[in-house]
Each structure stands twice: as C-alpha cells, then as structure tokens.
Amino acid sequence: MTKILNINSSVRIGDSISRKVTTEFINKWKAREADAIVVERDLAAQPLPHIDGSTLGAFFTPAEQRTPEQAQIATLSETLVRELFDADVIVIGAPMYNFSITSGLKAWIDHVARAGVTFKYTDKGPVGLLTGKKVYIFTASGGVYSEGPAQAMDFNATYLRTVLGFIGLTDVTIINSEGVAMGAEGVNKALAKTSNTINELLPA
C-alpha cells in the first residue's frame, strides 16, 4: 500500500494549473492502486507560519529542555517532518512565482529542512536522511523556462531539486506545465503535454 503526500502550494484555489495536474496525477495513481493512502498538505488553505527567532530557538533547544511555548512551536515542524518520513511518494505542486517557488512552499521547506532531523553533518559533509522515496514535482509557469533563453531564470525547479536532494530526496521527476500565460491555446497545449507525461509515468 503506497502512502502519498500531496503538497499544493499555489495560492489560487479554484483555477490553479498546478493543482489541476497534481489532482490528475493523484487520480490516475488511485485508479491503478485503489488502496493508496493520500495525505493532503495544502499550503494555501492552511498556510504555515514563516520561521522567526522563536522558531529557531525551539528547533535548536533539546526536546526535554523546551518551554511549553517552544514545544508547541516545534510540534508543527515535527508533524510536517513525520508526513515526509511516512510517505513513500511525495507529489509537489510548485507554480513559479517571480522565477522561484511560492512563499508558502518556502515556509514548508524551512520547517522540514532541519539539521539533525532530515539531514546531518558528518566529517564527509552533509547527509540527507529522507532516503528511498520518490518525488514528483509539477511546476506551472507563464513562460517557458525548462529550455531556451529563459532557462537561466528558473529558480523554481532547480532550487527544489537542490534543497530536496540535500535532505535525501534525490529521486526527483519534474513535470513542467509551461507557457500558460500565452492564451487559451498555451494552457491547452501545456495541459495536454502534462497529461501525456502523466500517462507515460503511470501507464494503465
């Protein structure tokens, strides 16, 4: 039984391209494996607090020494981390906002990328602790950034691949829905291409 963590980060709830394609992917997976468990983490419907000094203080204080306030702060991060460790497959909807990820997704990363929890430092360098999992990232962007002259401006997929790899999530497939700001034809073309990719990834 596969456990899937589905993370959506678009602030657009009703007409989001990234939400549309992650839903299509999840539905396709469920059609193949009806008993798969899907855990939803919606970073727009349930936004996470951005980390501050109090958050860092809680993270770096041993659990047995935390104040009640620090314990409460750390509980949220520990819940998010547990969702990652429990998942076999991680699906991330990651629209590009100003060449990078959404602030909500950055907040999630800051809560889960923690030294001694999801990665550790060794004498040979940092080692990610979230291993043996498959990640699918569904990006959406108004222009085309996976190739061509704008490729150097992609700090969305490239950043996610880097930071996820740092915590051990190295088996990453990125599916881009690009050119969605180029009118209805651009949207339809992007969605059709993504649907074809999903069918290739999850053949019937």
Curated annotation (Swiss-Prot):
InterPro entries assigned: Flavodoxin_fold, Flavoprotein-like_sf, FMN-dep_NADH:Q_OxRdtase_AzoR1, NADH:quinone_OxRdtase_FMN_depd
Positions with a binding annotation for FMN: 10, 16-18, 96-99
Top EC group: oxidoreductase
Pfam families in UniProt: Flavodoxin_2
Domain of life: Bacteria
Keyword Chloroplast included in the entry's annotation: no
Required cofactor(s): FMN
Keyword vocabulary terms for this entry: Flavoprotein, FMN, NAD, Oxidoreductase
Cofactor note: Binds 1 FMN per subunit.
Keyword presence, NAD: yes
Any one Gene Ontology molecular-function term assigned to this protein's record: oxidoreductase activity, acting on NAD(P)H as acceptor
Enzyme Commission code: 1.6.5.-, 1.7.1.17
Catalytic activity: 2 a quinone + NADH + H(+) = 2 a 1,4-benzosemiquinone + NAD(+); N,N-dimethyl-1,4-phenylenediamine + anthranilate + 2 NAD(+) = 2-(4-dimethylaminophenyl)diazenylbenzoate + 2 NADH + 2 H(+)
Family label: Belongs to the azoreductase type 1 family.
Assembly, per entry: Homodimer.
Function: Quinone reductase that provides resistance to thiol-specific stress caused by electrophilic quinones.
Name of the protein in question: FMN-dependent NADH:quinone oxidoreductase
Organism of origin: Herminiimonas arsenicoxydans
Lineage: Bacteria, Pseudomonadati, Pseudomonadota, Betaproteobacteria, Burkholderiales
